[in-house]
Amino acid sequence: MIQFKNISKHYQLKGQTIHALDQINLDIPAGSIFGIIGYSGAGKSTLIRLINLLERPTHGQIIINQKDFTALNAQSLRQERANIGMIFQHFNLLQTKTVAANIEMPLKLLGYSKIEREKRLMELLDFIDLTHKKDAFPDELSGGQKQRVGIARALANHPKILLCDEATSALDPQTTKSVLALLKKINKEQGITIVMVTHEMDVIESICDHVAVMESGHVIETGPTVEIFSNPQHPTTKTFIQTVLQQHLPVNILSKLEHQHHHSIYRLQFLGKSAQEPVIQSMIKQFDISLNILFANMTEIDGTVIGQMFVQLLGDDTLIQQAIEFLERHGVSVNQSGEQV
């Protein structure tokens, strides 16, 4: 487990104190894919760089597997850093070195023999599916291939933790998808804890099982990704989720409804089992009401299906209330439009 305990990071800039991080307390479970999301300047990149002490906190402790990294001497810290790999937005490959030389570099620095380096190199090239690019130079690679080389280099010494700082933000959507699939494979097959900094909520949706939302140097919300998506509390979190999971009726639909007879609009949210059962069909059969579907969407997060639907319920008020209670008994969250959701 990675633990941030009362972490603060302050900078001096033109005579002023900048509070990059302020009183951060956060636990990252071992073996998880943990996303850290926030807008530019939120402090997320500073936070991830504290894990391997590329940045040192002004106050607080970084505890990894029950070791306080902030209390380690230089030699002990070097040894512990060997268990932490890192990949970057712009790949950070040596342009004058081949793919093989880039991947082997950390192994050379750590004193691996030539035979050991060659063996590990071929394992990694096979794993990232770039054996045919062994002797190529970075300029001959696509963005996705460069990032795969960066990932292989980060994995060279069998790390227990992999830090990803905006690792997909320079890639096109299809390449992003393939890189995320590779990271998920690494986590599943090797049990490596992955910490991902991103400003893209679809990255969190695609791969992360836990997430922390940051704003102005604070963690404003954190928890399992499914819980955060299904029940966001902070306005900033809701804004992020809105980019991948519609939380409000689209404006064009609302404008059409303005000219229709008023009917209450409800937001129905289905989670897990309720998203896969014919709950709506059962409700319509049981109650003498009509249902007008205005908008619906569905996604899968960490193996759990989340669906939501904006509907008008038409009919007798008593029957509508009974229908709502029926839905809630069957695991559907019901909120009338305009209520806090």
From Swiss-Prot:
Q: Which UniProt keywords apply?
A: Amino-acid transport, ATP-binding, Cell inner membrane, Cell membrane, Membrane, Nucleotide-binding, Translocase, Transport
Q: Which InterPro entries match?
A: AAA+_ATPase, ABC_transporter-like_ATP-bd, ABC_transporter-like_CS, ACT-like_dom_sf, MetN_ABC, MetN_ABC_transporter-like, NIL_domain, P-loop_NTPase
* EC code(s) of this entry: 7.4.2.11
Domain called ABC transporter: residue spans: 2-241
Reaction(s) catalysed by this chain's protein: L-methionine(out) + ATP + H2O = L-methionine(in) + ADP + phosphate + H(+); D-methionine(out) + ATP + H2O = D-methionine(in) + ADP + phosphate + H(+)
Subcellular localization: Cell inner membrane
What EC class is this?
A: translocase
Question: What Pfam families does the entry give?
Answer: ABC_tran, NIL
CDD domains membership: ABC_MetN_methionine_transporter (cd03258)
Q: Where does ATP bind?
A: G38, Y39, S40, G41, A42, G43, K44, S45
Write out the GO MF terms. ABC-type D-methionine transporter activity; ATP binding; ATP hydrolysis activity
> Superkingdom, according to UniProt?
Bacteria
SMART domains the record matches: AAA, NIL
Subunit annotation: The complex is composed of two ATP-binding proteins (MetN), two transmembrane proteins (MetI) and a solute-binding protein (MetQ).
Q: Which family does it belong to?
A: Belongs to the ABC transporter superfamily. Methionine importer (TC 3.A.1.24) family.
Q: What job does this protein perform?
A: Part of the ABC transporter complex MetNIQ involved in methionine import. Responsible for energy coupling to the transport system.
Its recorded name reads Methionine import ATP-binding protein MetN 2
Q: What is the lineage of its organism?
A: Bacteria, Pseudomonadati, Pseudomonadota, Gammaproteobacteria, Moraxellales
